[in-house]
Amino acid sequence: MSQVFALITSDSALVRCELDRVRSQFPLEGGSVVGVGGWQDGQVVQQRYGQGAPTEEAWEAPDSEVVMMASRPLGVGEGIEDSSQPFRFRQWLFAAAGSLDRGTEVRDRLREELPEFLAAAVRGPTWEEAAFARYLAELRNIGRIEDPQLDSATAAACLASCAKAIEQVSGLTGVTTRPGFT
């Protein structure tokens, strides 16, 4: 199962101090892939660390006011580039944690419903990446996918709509339990 956390601070110079404070609460397991993302000089920056790679460098986050870190075991045959979070699309970073029954089937169904350019962006085997693309589709539907000033209420409404769509697709694939993701 994935682990995710995001850190927001008022001063990018303080981000490493803040990361040191939470480090013990977010153990990076040796068999997991780790991804770190943030924004530096207005650009999305991202780094991935494969299974068995030293994760000490993961804590050396970019000079950013916002940092997102995700960790999860890598499945058999999965590649680090297509399977590790956070996922990136243009200026967006996205990560999800939790579990989803029949994740591969849900991923495939979600991907079928996406606009072609977003479906092409879903390269990996994870349902989380398809969920991200579905969220981007929600933003696109209201003409805000490129909006750097997207307000939190609109972002939350699109995320809620995305979660509802995932729940509906899960039901169509025969999942009887509610998705357990955050």
Predicted ranges, named:
Residues 99-107, 123:
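Acidic, low-complexity central loop/insert segments
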Residues 38-69, 148-151:
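Short, compositionally biased leader-like segments
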Residues 2, 93-102:
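Conserved beta-strand-loop-short alpha-helix elements that form
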Residues 50-58, 69-90, 107-117:
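Short acidic (Asp/Glu) patches
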Residues 1-52:
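Extreme N-terminus nucleophile/cap motif
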Residues 44-45, 141-161:
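Extended, highly charged
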Residues 151-182:
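Catalytic core of PPM/PP2C metal-dependent serine/threonine phosphatase domains
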